[in-house]
Amino acid sequence: VLFLTFDDWGTDVPINRLLYVLRKHNVKATFFVRANYVEYNPNLLRSIAEEGHEIASHSYAHLPLADYNEGTGRYTSLTEEELLELRADLVRSYRELYRYVGDVEVDGVPSLSALFRPPTLSVSYEGLSQVFDVGFTYSVSGDFSTHDYEAESLEQLIDTFKNGIVTGQRRLRIQNGSCIVMHMSDESKYTAQALDIMIPIWKEQGYSFARLDSYLTQDGQDGGR
């Protein structure tokens, strides 16, 4: 199984392109939404939910769970003031999403889940403690971050999907169980088209696709499927 996930937010054009491709190939995905933009286009969020995709939080204002020190190149813990601000942000993000899609169910399955994706994928013990303390059940990063918003061409993004990502001396490749990190932003202009090409290839390789919450239970235990 592969898990297709999309972060942040975007305008009608990139998001509707993604929805078209997912619908065309009968694939469900997980959308980690930055909630502070949703109020400007709530019907677009409902469109995602009503297609049967999972809606989850990517924070309200993209506050990180750890501070990055440019001098050392390392992440450090948040201050007490930052933790309080983060906590309020987390609560607000879920409330905003619930406000617009909390009532949406498709085939008896709620669209809104209690999963969370950390902004910039950075974490700290104190930051994660806030995530779980306010009620989120899982913090989900991903094992294959495409950086699709940096792709300079369709061919480059397809090459990333097919041949992997080089990090240091390692080459990371998509494999069974991969959680693929993509974006629904306007900058990710090749993502939908690349998926239109790659999904049939992955299916031929024997992969299926699923929402993350179909493999993770709401009580924080593995679904075992």
Task: Please report, for each region that a protein language model flagged, where it lies by residue.
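Active-site beta->alpha N-cap acidic-glycine motif
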Residues: 1-81, 92-114
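Catalytic domains of cell-wall/extracellular-matrix polysaccharide-remodeling enzymes
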Residues: 39-40, 64-181, 185-202, 207-208, ...
